[in-house]
A protein has these predicted regions:
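Charged, often glycine-rich, active-site loop that binds/positions anionic groups
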Residues: 10-15, 180-195
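Serine-dependent amide/ester hydrolase catalytic core
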Residues: 167, 192-285
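Short, flexible loop segments at the rims of nucleotide/cofactor-binding pockets, characterized by
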Residues: 13, 23-25, 114-117, 222-228, ...
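Short, surface-exposed alpha-helical segments at coil->helix boundaries
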Residues: 153-157, 186-189
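A short beta-alpha structural unit
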Residues: 141, 145, 175-187, 210-214, ...
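Short glycine/serine-rich loop/turn segments
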Residues: 1-89, 142, 248-269
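Structural helix-boundary/capping segments
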Residues: 40-146, 157-166, 217, 223-227, ...
Length: 327
């Protein structure tokens, strides 16, 4: 089942997507159908789109691997956009090796995509064999490690101990902070305006409300948001002056119930959508490669994910450490 225009995975035309690990829970979104299909063994791999966490959140919630590549590494040509400035396309698989293989044929420059990066992809599968013993890990504790579900906090602490044995060092780092950027709403409305203004009744209620909100973003606010986005993508480079990779919990909370997701109060509830994307959205903003790998389960059997992020075009290093941890 598919969600409407990358909005979420609960309100779908064919009914809500359900988590294979607990069918009363959501699989995450918006690529929840892709994640659920991979987790249930219905396919070897699936593609997801990620604007605020829509590959990695479902990967964490469904105990699979989800890779959001560097912005522009995989062409978005032909994809219905949510936000031209933030959309990423990447693979969702059961193992890191599968993710490396799935990334290979879709990565690379597309001259017909204005956001495509002019880069020649390396052999991603070969990167799984490279040593990670010299890797310096960065831990951005501010924001990313705050207000975690106690079971996620416990599981991530265990994962960090494993990573410390695999790598050279760990140290705390600071990442650039930002306020809410109105870029997504404005760009989503711009794409949908020709259809939305003529037949708004064809859109689901949640999508309709969010598009209406995007229509109210002023030109000045959008321009300032784009300027801030460019600043953040330049500023985050300095975070890798003393570390090679970053490690964060993929989500600060466990998957909510389908019933809660369908209630749709119109604005994110406490602990709801905004919080569930708190740890994933920054890496869309920064445009950095980020992979979520399974790292355990809650006592009630709900999956928990660990994220590893790298510098611009650092997919090889991200995959290498993710694979080493997985083993």
């Amino acid at each position: 089942t598919f969600t409407e225009y990358g909005d979420s995975s609960a309100p779908s035309h064919f009914g809500p997507v359900r988590n294979p690990w607990n069918t009363e829970r959501v699989p995450g979104g918006s690529s929840g159908g892709s994640a659920a299909a991979v987790a249930a063994g219905l396919c070897y791999a699936a593609l997801g789109s990620d604007t605020g966490g829509s590959i990695r959140q479902p990967a964490a919630y469904c105990s699979i691997v989800g890779l959001k590549p560097t912005y522009g590494l995989v062409s978005t040509r032909g994809v219905v956009p949510l936000s031209w400035s933030l959309d990423h396309i990447g693979p969702m698989c059961r193992t890191v090796a599968d993710a490396a293989l799935a990334l290979q044929p879709i990565a690379g420059h597309d001259p017909l995509d204005t956001n495509s990066v002019a880069a020649t992809p390396p052999d991603y599968a070969a990167s799984l064999r490279q040593s990670v013993s010299a890797v310096r890990l960065g831990i951005p504790r501010a924001v990313f490690y705050e207000a975690l579900d106690p079971e996620i906090e416990r599981t991530i602490s265990d994962a960090l101990r494993v990573l410390q044995k695999l790598t050279a060092s760990t140290r705390d780092v600071e990442l650039p902070r930002y306020n809410n950027l109105p870029v997504v709403g404005a760009e989503a409305y711009t794409f949908h305006a020709p259809y939305f203004t003529k037949t708004p009744e064809r859109y689901q209620s949640m999508t309709r409300r969010r598009l209406e909100a995007g229509s109210r973003v002023t030109a000045a606010a959008y321009i300032e948001g784009r300027r801030e986005l460019d600043r953040l993508r330049h500023a985050v480079v300095s975070a890798f002056s003393t570390v090679d990779l970053l490690v964060t919990p993929t989500t600060p909370i466990l998957p909510t119930t389908v019933t809660q997701a369908l209630n749709d109060p119109g604005t994110p509830p406490p602990g709801g959508v905004a919080l569930s994307l708190r740890n994933t959205q920054p890496f869309d903003i920064y445009g950095l490669p980020c992979i979520s790998v399974p790292c355990g389960f809650s006592r009630s059997g709900l999956p928990i994910g660990l994220s590893i992020s790298g510098p611009h075009l650092g997919e090889r290093e991200v995959l290498a450490l993710a694979h080493a941890y997985e083993q």
